[in-house]
């Protein structure tokens, strides 16, 4: 297939695409329009939110859901503080100041968002969508009342960050991406980008400020990936150290010396693994493409692979070797690390493939390995959402869209004959695609149209080959992720016949 043919496919108005109802730019809804008073305020901002406070029994349920489903992956609120909030919420909620009330409603909203519709109805006696809209409105009103845009208080920033972490629906993607800029500015105004050791702050405040800064950074990268743009926070903009590998019980406000770090898995390990992956991601982004030498290898490409290998070794030594895969949160941590490293390995290869002068015929030994790795990135990304071990935290992974692996596999399926590896690729592609554009909403955003067109083309070619595919994902077992990505088992194609197709998608979306 020639590049011109593929570009015609992407540019043609007659090309197969989504209907207007499924467009990647959703129409404004009543829910999304609520955000205006949150940012600017208006005269009808509620003077009291008393009617939004739930009965004590419901407060207990929501706090329990927050501790199980949200706190393990967004550890920006100290557990003793949670207990104090619950005590006040269930005894005399009118005693809350405006700042604490904003955090309280953010906790309620995130707890509801983390629950399945069935659990919401059974435990709270109300529809999840209705509750989400109700408490989102309460959060936005509370943030306005707390003076969010002018705040100098950490607790208000915690409330805003928690709120944005839960605004993961496709219609909120641009809103979150925009609001992260505001949150980042507020964080800078509070000096979170500077390590608190410069200011002589105590160990407790230092640690909580580090946790909040790094989670804002994680949220910035996540929202930017969804919009196919660069993060707003750049390396060199901050010197805030990583949080300590400790449990909340090791930390208290009256400490005068920082607690010693633990060896092994702690409550902070998952967050620290995500932060180390983030640092790797930013390092790889800084390594720009350059020319290819006569052997078809790029010095910077080798540097990328070396950086990935060094990160993998460091993660294994410091964190992953302590993971007990029979424990759910340990399994999630190990799986996130392996999938992220595999994705970084893929993207590094894709960057090499996009460099001027790249010769795919000099790359035969990597062909099937690239395909198999892309398949496993999709398979294990799917498992992170659907496996019983991750039920409590699946809401977080719904924002994970490894579109590069998805596009690469579809590009390969446009040129590959029917074979077991192709069948497995189609199963992985179909599984994740159904979730991305399923009942929870279209997650692909700006990437939707080119990926949809590419999928339609690959499906048409598949139909011509007249081979049914069994929708079976037995090849992806939950316990297989820890050792890493397997070796290819099929005969190599010899070269990447799909390169023109894939690179056109990359140029359309941006890698």
Over which residues does each language-model region extend?
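Intrinsic, low-complexity transcriptional activation domains
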Residues: 1-71, 94, 98-103, 108, ...
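Fungal transcription factor middle regulatory core
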Residues: 8, 15-30, 87, 118, ...
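Intrinsically disordered, low-complexity transcriptional activation domains
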Residues: 16, 394, 473-511
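Carboxylate/His-rich catalytic cores and anion/metal-binding grooves
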Residues: 59-143
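Short coil/turn linker motifs that delimit alpha-helical repeat modules in TPR/alpha-solenoid proteins
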Residues: 100, 152, 202, 209, ...
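Tandem amphipathic alpha-helical repeat scaffolds
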Residues: 108-114, 161-168, 222, 279, ...
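Long, amphipathic alpha-helical regulatory blocks in the mid-to-C-terminal portion
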Residues: 130-158, 162, 178-197, 215, ...
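Eukaryote-biased recognition of C-terminal alpha-helical segments
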Residues: 345, 409-412, 416, 432-489
